């Protein structure tokens, strides 16, 4: 046993070696005995609140509103049959059976911002303001040589490179070169401003 920590028995006051003053209501000793355990959450009997669950008590509310039997188990989280509510939507992207990606629609849960701007009337939710067609990606110019298929190696497209059509070369022609003033000291040292 730890000689420094030697708890006293029940009802023995704490050892106050330094004479420290404690506020009113501070427990100056161990409790005589722990309070008895009560299964009630709240003290005192309350007829509206039952103290605990009695085993074998039937449910107050039935699981099924029409009969007292428990509905059969279904792995689907949707309690409604699919045939009762047809899956139909005015927006193709929200319809799981429509062609995906045909149009980009705005799923509207309120009116578009420009409709309710500076107004206090709640506008009805109508058709989307715009239906964007699916964007066509712009052709990107890559750094592949002319005649070479992108994503291939040189060995795969060497025949295409060698046999592809090239324009006929231009015949040599005369090029006139202008005559330049030979370098030297300029004859002027000041250029007047061009007002």
Curated annotation (Swiss-Prot):
A Gene Ontology term for the protein's cellular component: perinuclear region of cytoplasm
* Membrane-side (Extracellular) residue stretches: 44-143
Question: Can you tell me where the transmembrane regions are?
Answer: 19-43, 144-162
Give the Cytoplasmic membrane side ranges. 1-18, 163-195
For this UniProt record, give its keywords in alphabetical order, as a comma-separated list: Cell membrane, Cell projection, Cytoplasm, Membrane, Transmembrane, Transmembrane helix
- Which segments of the protein form a coiled coil according to its record? none
**What is the membrane topology noted in the UniProt record heading this document?**
Multi-pass membrane protein
State where it is primarily located: cytoplasm
Spell out the Pfam families in the cross-references: TCRP1 (PF14944)
Q: Where in the cell is it found?
A: Cytoplasm, Perinuclear region; Cell membrane; Cell projection, Axon
**What InterPro entries does UniProt report for this protein, alphabetically?**
FAM168A/MANI
Q: Which domain of life is it from?
A: Eukaryota
Q: What does this protein do?
A: Inhibitor of neuronal axonal outgrowth.
Q: Which family does it belong to?
A: Belongs to the FAM168 family.
The protein's name in its UniProt record: Myelin-associated neurite-outgrowth inhibitor
